[in-house]
């Protein structure tokens, strides 16, 4: 074999080894790549809460008739969607509460649902007046939550003074302690309670006006 032929043979072997290494690396990258979150909603940066709190109890009351309107306002099979800026905080809160579980009563709320709610209860003290921009639930930046099985003193959407986050009159000591535990866990994740409702927590920038998300719930 001439020197030229020998050089070509060596070059071919080296090329084959490099190609094999590239293929192997690609396989490893694929095998260990992070798994994409289920059902991400990238356009409006909303995510399914179960992708960040896998053991969440999702009990969307507005997907049933068990709510103050008495109507099913969300389609059957609706997801609990939150803005991605809340994801880390909710994961922290859930970790603080385990083995108890977070129950989600409401997350992202479409604008037309907010309009219907205000038609039924046109009192801004209890139902936010629909505006021309998305805030809070309408932007996916607020959640309504409780602790599974815990006595909290009232049910969801109880339009009485006992629903206030720091209420004492008519709220027993155990319920006050449970509300405090929920607040502490959520605050550890950077989420703040709305003083008018012990179950309502806001994420970063919840009060800032934003475009309405165009996101399907189911």
Regions found by a protein language model. Name each.
Residues 110:
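Segments that shape or occlude catalytic/ligand-binding pockets
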Residues 4-19:
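Bacterial N-terminal signal peptides that target proteins for export
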Residues 2, 20, 26-107, 117-218:
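Extracytoplasmic cell-surface/polysaccharide-interacting catalytic and binding patches
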Residues 113-114:
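Short, well-ordered surface patches within globular domains
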């Amino acid at each position: 074999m001439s020197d030229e032929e020998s050089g070509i043979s060596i070059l071919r072997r080296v090329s084959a080894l490099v190609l094999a290494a590239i293929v192997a690396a690609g396989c490893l990258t694929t095998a260990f790549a992070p798994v994409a979150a289920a059902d991400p909603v990238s356009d409006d940066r909303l995510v399914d809460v179960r992708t960040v709190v896998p053991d969440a109890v999702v009990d969307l009351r507005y997907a049933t008739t068990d709510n103050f309107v008495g109507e099913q306002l969300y389609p059957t099979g609706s997801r609990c969607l939150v803005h991605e800026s809340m994801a880390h905080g909710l994961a922290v809160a859930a970790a603080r509460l385990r083995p108890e579980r977070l129950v989600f009563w409401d997350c992202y709320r479409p604008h037309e649902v907010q309009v219907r709610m205000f038609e039924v209860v046109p009192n801004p003290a209890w139902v936010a007046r629909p505006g021309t921009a998305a805030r809070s639930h309408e932007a996916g930046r607020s959640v309504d939550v409780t602790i599974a099985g815990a006595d909290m003193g009232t049910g969801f959407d109880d339009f009485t003074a006992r629903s206030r986050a720091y209420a004492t009159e008519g709220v027993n000591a155990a319920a006050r302690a449970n509300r405090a535990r929920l607040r502490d866990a959520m605050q550890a994740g950077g989420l703040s309670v709305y003083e008018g409702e012990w179950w309502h927590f806001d994420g970063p920038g919840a009060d800032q006006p934003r475009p309405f998300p165009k996101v399907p719930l189911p």
